[in-house]
Amino acid sequence: MKKKNISPSLVLHPLLLLLLPFFAFNSLALKFSPQLLSLLSLKTSLSGPPSAFQDWKVPVNGQNDAVWCSWSGVVCDNVTAQVISLDLSHRNLSGRIPIQIRYLSSLLYLNLSGNSLEGSFPTSIFDLTKLTTLDISRNSFDSSFPPGISKLKFLKVFNAFSNNFEGLLPSDVSRLRFLEELNFGGSYFEGEIPAAYGGLQRLKFIHLAGNVLGGKLPPRLGLLTELQHMEIGYNHFNGNIPSEFALLSNLKYFDVSNCSLSGSLPQELGNLSNLETLFLFQNGFTGEIPESYSNLKSLKLLDFSSNQLSGSIPSGFSTLKNLTWLSLISNNLSGEVPEGIGELPELTTLFLWNNNFTGVLPHKLGSNGKLETMDVSNNSFTGTIPSSLCHGNKLYKLILFSNMFEGELPKSLTRCESLWRFRSQNNRLNGTIPIGFGSLRNLTFVDLSNNRFTDQIPADFATAPVLQYLNLSTNFFHRKLPENIWKAPNLQIFSASFSNLIGEIPNYVGCKSFYRIELQGNSLNGTIPWDIGHCEKLLCLNLSQNHLNGIIPWEISTLPSIADVDLSHNLLTGTIPSDFGSSKTITTFNVSYNQLIGPIPSGSFAHLNPSFFSSNEGLCGDLVGKPCNSDRFNAGNADIDGHHKEERPKKTAGAIVWILAAAIGVGFFVLVAATRCFQKSYGNRVDGGGRNGGDIGPWKLTAFQRLNFTADDVVECLSKTDNILGMGSTGTVYKAEMPNGEIIAVKKLWGKNKENGKIRRRKSGVLAEVDVLGNVRHRNIVRLLGCCTNRDCTMLLYEYMPNGSLDDLLHGGDKTMTAAAEWTALYQIAIGVAQGICYLHHDCDPVIVHRDLKPSNILLDADFEARVADFGVAKLIQTDESMSVVAGSYGYIAPEYAYTLQVDKKSDIYSYGVILLEIITGKRSVEPEFGEGNSIVDWVRSKLKTKEDVEEVLDKSMGRSCSLIREEMKQMLRIALLCTSRSPTDRPPMRDVLLILQEAKPKRKTVGDNVIVVGDVNDVNFEDVCSVDVGHDVKCQRIGV
């Protein structure tokens, strides 16, 4: 069908009708200017916040014919009043560009970047034939890029970065003979790069990275003699780099990383004397690094990582005096590192890990005072560690593991105030570990395991202010543990296994932060200190293969999160305290090869591996196939009951007896009697406690969707599993597999026997609340599938989330993402949480207040999408009238709660702000370094109040050195500070928080296993894109932007 020609007046007619009241008194003055009507059509067609077009108003007095020339974003010609520049960038606009934009016929500059414009790209823009700059980057335009751009014959700059275009790259771009900058990066273009692009003789900048382009690289691109920046990485090309690219004599930046290229590196690239950045990583290049590359005297950044290169580092690299970044990781390179590399005056980053290098490291490495990070792990380096590595006190990451380094650690490292992460395991280092590491205020991670260190473990490790991980296992200390080791303020994981330690285990007083303690395979003796109950966060305790004696402290069973206990291969005696049978968290309890007697506790122990109790001749019970002699053990219990009828004495009772005995001077016989009494009190626990009597009635299942299992299925599954996913203030969560194979999460709310709280439930209130929660449906909310209840217990049935929680991701220490990918994922999680809370606050009737928002209540589904859990559950339980109910968790509770004892939507906003601060800083909501009584909110505000560099607050491991990520983190910091305002009235509603977050959302795209992080055409900084190899530190690679 043939298109009709439509006159401008007819096109504008509907708009005139719409605006008729507006011009009722002003029609003559404004003369219905197409300039005005085109701009007003933009205003009416695009949606955005009120501020977007706040000053785009037409006066009713008719005093200004060209009123639009004073509007924000609009620049007019001084003579004709025609619009020559229109900048609507970063206004949070959405919608589609109206056809009336074509009547801005004098427009030279049009910037629509940083919005959410969508749909096909409007061809009406191609009618703006005078345009010299067109920026549509960071929007959501989709479909194929339409033909017609060649009509913009004066165009110099075209930026379409980060959209959703697909199909082939437009070939008619090649007809833009004045074009200097071309950016089609970050979309989904496919096919080959048009060879005709090689005819753009004035082109200085081309960016096609982050698409799905394929085929061979066009040799004709070598004809772009004015080109300074070529960025075409993260595509799927094949073949080699054309030798014609050596003709790009003005090229400064060249990036073909992650492109599936192969073959040898072209010798001719060594002729690019102006080249400053050369990124060829993650390809299939083979052969040696050409010696001609030593001619690249301007080179600052060189990354050949993750290829199949062989041979050695060219000796001429020692002459690259401007080089700051050298990364050759994961190749087959060998030989020695040229000595001159250590004397490069600007070198800040050296990555050589996972090669076959030999010899010693350059002895002057770091002497330039600028070295910041070095990783030479997984090679065959020998000799000593250079003492000059931290000469400028800027080194923050030093990774040396899996080599053959020998000699002592340089004492200079103990003065390296910048050091954050130090890994030197699996070497041949010897001598004494120098004192001083404990004074390093930034040191968080130290691994010196599997070396030959001797003498004493430095006691000052216990004073290291932020140290979280310390591994000294497999060494030759032959000394006692430092008495103060458990007082380390932030130490979470401590391993000194198989290190020839002797003596007794120090008392556990002060053991507040430890998650894992590994002391197996030593020669420790004495008893296990009873005050291990101080280790409140302990998950894993391994004291196996030592010479420990005495009884097993019942205090271990009271640790709220303890999961793995290994006391095997010792000389322990007595019985296993019955308290362990009621533990809800223990999944492993290995006491094999000891001298234990008596019954194995029932309860949760019934599902443990029988081998955990082997080689204890005196143990009895079903697990070891030996029936217990009830008369023998009952007699023993009766004897104890005669002395302690009212309640079994705990450790403190035994301690009192010891004190009294010493005080009155009664000697040996009284001590024996007290000891016997104390040991018998442990035996009494075999038959005591932990049993719930009485009839609790039948189970009832209330389902909120169709379920393929029954209440009995749930109860039976829980009776057979000890797979605890978590435990909190409201109950314990189990992973349960139903008979049909479906996996769900079951939250058993605390009953009346939880500690001494004597919690009771209001039956009707519970059911009413559950009914409200069961009807919540949102993609960012964990779905409540149903509820099982009886007279004494309530269990909530949720969909199972396989990827753990945000707390695991932030603080679990298992980094499986790159820095850029992790930040992007965390930002998306933050948005997901905001969307979920926004739904609860603004779309539910009645409004649902979460009451306990924290990272452990934010779960991650199979796609790492955030799902808010435990919303409203805190209202389902209450304590006796004499007990006070604390709504929320320490560190996340809004300050006004202290005097109002009320929780509302603003309380959730505060908790959400704390979560954002945890994401930004990498720290927990409460840490010792914040000072007594202070939270992360106080700490951040104190840092900003003292005018410390805001970047010092940002998490180093999250890529804060990357300009784009750094600015995004600062933006999130501003939002977090708003949310954690002391006054509730100053906190924005979650709807506004969500809007701000979405406006500042980072533009990232994933292709395969790679995250594309590419910057704006006008941004000449660099992004760090980090990859993780199993067992390695984060490896940073860079993508120029």
From Swiss-Prot:
Main location: membrane
Mutant phenotype after disruption: Reduced procambial cells number, and adjacent or interspersed xylem and phloem formation.
LRR repeats: 80-104, 105-128, 130-152, 154-176, 177-199, 200-224, 225-248, 250-272, 273-296, 297-319, 321-344, 345-368, 369-392, 394-416, 418-439, 440-464, 466-488, 511-535, 536-558, 559-583, 585-607
Modified residues (Phosphothreonine): 710, 900
Impact after mutating residue 421 to A: Slightly reduced interaction with CLE41 peptide. Impaired interaction with CLE41 peptide leading to a cambium-defective phenotype and adjacent phloem and xylem cells
Domain Protein kinase: 719-1001
Outcome after substituting residue 186 to A: Reduced interaction with CLE41 peptide leading to desorganized vascular tissues
Side Cytoplasmic, residues: 674-1041
Signal peptide span: 1-29
InterPro entries the record matches: Kinase-like_dom_sf, Leu-rich_rpt, Leu-rich_rpt_typical-subtyp, LRR_dom_sf, LRR_N_plant-typ, LRR_R13L4/SHOC2-like, Plant_LRR-RLKs, Prot_kinase_dom
Lineage: superkingdom: Eukaryota
Residues binding ATP: 725-733, 747
Active site: 852 (proton acceptor)
Tissue: Widely expressed along the vascular strands. In roots and hypocotyls, confined to procambial cells.
Biological-process GO terms, alphabetical: cell division; phloem or xylem histogenesis; procambium histogenesis; secondary shoot formation; xylem development
Function, in words: Acts with CLE41p and CLE44p peptides as a ligand-receptor pair in a signal transduction pathway involved in the regulation of procambium maintenance and polarity during vascular-tissue development. Mediates repression of tracheary element differentiation and the promotion of procambial cells formation and polar division adjacent to phloem cells in the veins.
PANTHER family listed in its UniProt record: LRR RECEPTOR-LIKE SERINE/THREONINE-PROTEIN KINASE-RELATED, PROTEIN KINASE DOMAIN-CONTAINING PROTEIN
Family, as annotated: Belongs to the protein kinase superfamily. Ser/Thr protein kinase family.
Protein name: Leucine-rich repeat receptor-like protein kinase TDR
Species of origin: Arabidopsis thaliana (Mouse-ear cress)
Gene: TDR
